[in-house]
Amino acid sequence: SPPCCTNQNIRRPDVAYLTPELVAQFGNLATLPQSFPLIAEIVSPTDIAEDVFLKAQEYLESSCQEVWLVFPESRLIFVMTQNQILTFRSGDTASTQQILLGFSIDVDRLLA
């Protein structure tokens, strides 16, 4: 993903979704002047969980509507919005809550 601006930093999410409206508005810019509406961060075993959750909160405080934190080693996905955190594990089907409504994927398939 290209970089985006949060209220605090310039960040480069692992995976991000940009709505067609935002593509039309900002598509040619090298750095998005706001957070993406949907962001996924792939968490490595060396990442500090507290830092990962703080980064997700930073995105959510900067116009992002939904953040997926993907923990491949523990086979967990946390889907965070402004008012909830959902946990999906092996055997579950993770689904979007705010953006790309109707998108879902089996956790095991995503982490295969």
Located regions from the model:
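C-terminal interaction segment
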Residues: S1-S62, E66-A112
